[in-house]
From Swiss-Prot:
GO BP terms in the entry: lipid catabolic process
Active-site residues annotated for this sequence: 340, 404, 497
Documented EC number(s): 3.1.1.3
Name under which the protein is recorded: Triacylglycerol lipase OBL1
Top EC category: hydrolase
Organism encoding this protein: Ricinus communis
Length: 526
C-alpha cells in the first residue's frame, strides 16, 4: 500500500473444491499425491500450490465443501419448506387452530417477505424485545458519554471491564445480529414497535462470485433526529445456505499490501471483487464510497463497467449510507455488529474503512461487537488493525460461546495462518465469561476435544428444560431450539452456534472470578 492508501499488491491463493474431483482428493490423502492435491489451488506464485498441498489442513475444508455442495439444492428446498411449515403452524395457532381454520374456511397461508413471516432462526429464539426495557434515547446518551468519559480509562482495564458491564449495548448488538436474519418488513416492525428506534434501510448486496443477492445488512438509529447511536448489523450464515457454509470453510486468501491477507469469500460477500478476476479486489478497495446513498446512486449511473458491480455490493451501500447519517447526526457514534458470517462482515467492514483511510468515519466508531465470528485473515491483518482499532482504547470485542465451531474456522495452520485479533470475550456453558486472546480448543475437529464437547452438548440439552425455572419465562426455550440441541449431540459445534446461546450469554453472563487471562495482562496488550 502506498502513501495514498492504495492497494498495490494482490497476491492470492485460491482454494477451489470445484477444480478437483473426489478421486483427486483421495489420491492426495491416501497416496500422498501432491500433484492431485495441487489441482485444488490457484496462486499468484506458481510454486505455492505444491507447498500448500503438502503442509496445510486444506483437505478437511475441501472435503466438507464438496460434501456440502452435493446437498445444495436439497438444503435450499428443505429451508423453504421448514420456513413455510413453521409459519403455517404458528400463524394458524397450532394444530387445533389449523383444524378450526380449515372448518371455518379461513386457513392462513404464510407469505414470504411479509411482516409476520419469521425465519427458522427467529423460531429458534422467539425473543424480540431488548433486555429489560428498550434502549431509549437517554440510555444511548449514557452509552456514548461512558465511552468518552476519561475517568473510565484507567489504562485499558476499566474500558475492557466495561465491555461485560455495558449489557444494554451488548444486548442491542446481539439482538440486532439475530434480527438481521429476518426479512425487511419484520426488521422494520421490530425496530420501530419493539425497540422504539428509527429504521433507516435494509440492503441486499450482490455477490457476483455466487451470482446471488445474498448478503444483507440493515441500519437503524436510536431516534430519527439528532441521533446519538447508529447501528449497522450484517446477516450471518443461513442455516440452510450451503454457499454460506462453504464461505465459512473457505481457505482462499488475497493479499492487500501492508494490510495483510484477507479471506476471499468474505470480500466477495461484501461485493468487493471476484476470485476469477483478482484485480477486481484492487479496483474496488482503492475506490472510496460516496458520501451518501443518494450520491452512490448518481455515481453508479455513470460509473465504468468495472465499478458498477462494486457499487451494488453491501459494502458500498452500507458505507455510503453511514457517511450520510454521520453528516445528518453530528453527535452520533456508530456500532457495527453481526453473528456468524455477519460477524466476519462486520469486522471486515471496519477493516476496509481503515485500509481506505476513512479517518473521519472511524473517529466516530464506538464499538464492533461480533458473535460467533469466523477468522477473516492472517496474522499480518491482525497486526495492521490492532493498534488502529484497539488503541488508545479497545473498540473491537469478539464474543465466543463455548464449543461454537464457527469461530474456529477457517483452520489456522503453518501455511494459511488464519488468526483472530481483537479482544475475545469467551463464555462457557454456565455463562461464565472471561477475556482472552484466543478461545480455547482452536481445532474444532480434534479428537481430544470430542468427549468433553459431547458431554457439554448433553448438559446444554438438559439445561434447556430448566433455565426458565431458574431465571424466568424469558429463558424458556422453544421446541425448535431443543430439536437443534438434539442435533448437537452428534455435532456439538454446530448447535453451540445458535443465537440462543449468545443472547443468554449476554443477559446471564457473569465474569469468572479467576479468569485465565487477567484484565491487567489484557490492559498491557498481551
Amino acid at each position: 500500500m502506498d502513501d495514498a492508501g492504495k492497494i498495490t499488491s494482490t497476491s492470492h491463493l485460491i482454494v477451489s473444491p470445484d477444480e478437483g474431483t473426489f478421486l483427486d482428493l483421495f489420491k492426495h490423502i491416501v497416496l500422498s499425491d501432491l500433484g492431485s492435491g495441487a489441482k485444488f489451488f490457484r496462486a499468484s506464485d506458481q510454486r505455492v500450490p505444491a507447498t500448500a498441498a503438502y503442509y496445510s489442513r486444506w483437505p478437511v475444508s475441501v472435503f466438507i465443501c464438496k460434501i456440502l455442495q452435493l446437498f445444495q439444492m436439497p438444503a435450499a428446498m428443505l429451508g423453504h419448506l421448514t420456513d413455510f411449515l413453521l409459519n403455517f403452524y404458528y400463524q394458524n395457532h397450532g394444530f387445533l387452530g389449523i383444524l378450526r381454520n380449515i372448518f371455518l374456511i379461513r386457513l392462513k397461508i404464510p407469505k414470504r417477505g411479509e411482516a409476520d413471516f419469521i425465519s427458522t432462526i427467529g423460531y429458534l429464539d422467539s425473543r424480540m424485545d431488548l433486555h429489560g426495557t428498550p434502549m431509549v434515547s437517554h440510555q444511548a446518551d449514557e452509552v456514548i458519554s461512558n465511552a468518552d468519559n476519561p475517568s473510565l480509562k484507567e489504562g485499558h482495564n476499566s474500558k475492557i471491564k466495561g465491555a461485560l458491564g455495558n449489557r444494554s449495548l451488548m444486548d442491542l448488538c446481539i439482538m440486532a445480529s439475530k434480527l438481521a436474519y429476518e426479512n425487511t418488513k419484520v426488521v422494520e416492525r421490530v425496530v420501530a414497535e419493539h425497540w422504539k428506534m428509527h429504521f433507516v434501510a435494509d440492503y441486499g448486496g450482490m455477490n457476483y462470485f455466487q451470482d446471488a443477492r445474498n448478503t444483507h445488512a440493515f441500519i437503524f438509529c436510536d431516534k430519527p433526529k439528532d441521533a446519538n447511536l447508529i447501528v449497522i448489523s450484517f446477516r450471518g450464515t443461513g442455516p440452510f445456505s450451503i454457499p454460506n457454509w462453504c464461505t465459512d470453510f473457505d481457505f482462499s486468501l488475497v493479499g492487500l499490501g501492508d494490510a495483510g491477507s484477507v479471506h476471499v469469500g468474505f470480500l466477495e460477500a461484501m461485493g468487493l471483487g471476484h476470485r476469477n478476476s483478482i484485480s477486481s479486489f484492487e479496483t474496488s478497495i482503492n475506490t472510496k464510497s460516496p458520501g451518501s446513498i443518494t450520491e452512490l446512486r448518481k455515481e453508479s449511473e455513470m460509473a465504468p463497467d468495472h465499478l458498477v458491480w462494486a457499487y451494488d455490493g453491501v459494502y458500498f451501500l452500507a458505507a455510503s449510507t453511514l457517511k450520510g447519517l454521520l453528516k445528518d447526526h453530528k453527535n452520533a457514534k456508530f456500532v457495527v455488529t453481526g453473528h456468524s458470517l455477519g460477524g466476519a462482515l462486520a469486522i471486515l467492514f471496519t477493516c476496509i474503512l481503515e485500509i481506505q483511510q476513512e479517518t473521519e468515519v472511524l473517529d466516530r466508531l464506538l464499538n464492533v461487537y461480533t458473535f460467533g465470528q469466523p477468522r477473516i485473515g492472517n496474522y499480518n491483518l491482525g497486526y495492521f488493525m490492532q493498534n488502529r482499532l484497539n488503541f488508545p482504547e479497545r473498540r473491537y470485542f469478539r464474543v465466543v460461546y463455548c464449543n461454537d465451531m464457527v469461530p474456529r474456522v477457517p483452520f489456522d495452520d503453518v501455511f494459511f495462518t488464519f488468526e483472530h485479533f481483537g479482544t475475545c470475550i469467551y463464555y462457557d456453558s454456565r455463562f461464565f465469561g472471561y477475556f482472552t486472546k484466543e478461545e480455547p480448543s482452536r481445532n474444532p475437529f480434534g479428537i481430544e476435544n470430542a468427549i468433553s464437547a459431547h458431554i457439554t452438548a448433553w448438559w446444554e440439552l438438559w439445561r434447556s428444560f430448566i433455565l426458565n425455572h431458574v431465571y424466568g419465562a424469558e429463558y424458556k426455550e422453544t421446541w425448535e431450539s431443543r430439536m437443534f440441541r438434539i442435533l448437537g449431540l452428534f455435532l456439538p459445534g454446530v448447535a453451540a452456534h445458535s443465537p440462543v446461546n449468545y443472547v443468554n450469554s449476554v443477559r446471564l453472563g457473569r465474569e469468572l472470578a479467576i479468569p485465565l487471562m487477567s484484565l491487567k495482562m489484557m490492559a498491557q496488550g498481551y
